[in-house]
Design a protein with these regions (language model features):
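Catalytic core of non-heme Fe(II) oxygenases with the double-stranded beta-helix
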Residues: 41-116, 126, 137-138, 149-160
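Double-stranded beta-helix
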Residues: 76, 141, 145-178
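Aromatic-acidic/polar surface patches that form glycan- and anion
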Residues: 4-11, 55, 108, 135
Length: 178
């Protein structure tokens, strides 16, 4: 319930600002707004890591780093398109490749950095190998999921018999079809 607690409101607002920017850049429906579905803390001691995973049920996910000692492990994203690596393009070895052409992208944890990504993106967090002892060696972050919901008072489609306000067929509508 971190996303509804007052002490985490500023962090939530930062994530919502990024969500609004994504909405603008991607040309999403202006009748929707970003909503934080949930938020949780990650306190990772030496050796702690997160295996590759996704966040089903949300549009975007985020991580906000609060503490990240040296060698505490990066977050990395892999290209979900299995065939993308079947035939590699001949990139110029004398020039660094652009980030968007890589099959894997790593982001170092930096305190104050918020990373937002599509919830379907496969990602993993490397083990915390910080040599600092005690609380100073912990990797501390807050993660969450964000979805776009219709703004209050906006109907997705005109309601019609057997359908809800979002235009989905209801049980009443299904009964009439049989």
């Amino acid at each position: 319930d971190m996303h509804v607690r007052e002490e985490y409101e500023d962090m939530g607002k930062e994530a919502l600002k990024v969500g609004l920017r994504i909405q603008e850049l991607m040309g999403l429906n202006p009748d929707t707004e970003p909503v934080i579905d949930n938020m949780w803390a990650n306190v990772s001691q030496f050796g702690a890591h997160n295996r590759n995973h996704t966040h089903p049920g949300s549009h975007f996910s985020f991580v906000y780093y609060l503490q990240s000692p040296e060698k505490c492990g990066s977050i990395w994203f892999s290209d979900p398109r299995a065939q993308a690596i079947a035939v590699q393009l001949p990139y110029n070895p004398k020039n660094p490749r652009k980030r968007e052409t890589l099959n894997e992208v790593y982001w170092a944890p930096v305190p104050g950095r918020l990373i937002m990504f599509p919830s379907w993106a496969v990602h993993e967090v490397e083990p915390n190998l910080s040599e600092l002892k005690g609380k100073k060696g912990l990797r501390v972050s807050v993660s969450g999921n964000l979805s776009f919901h219709l703004k209050k008072g906006v109907k997705y489609k005109e309601e019609r018999e057997g359908h809800d306000a979002k235009g989905f067929l209801t049980m009443k509508g299904a009964e009439k079809r049989t």
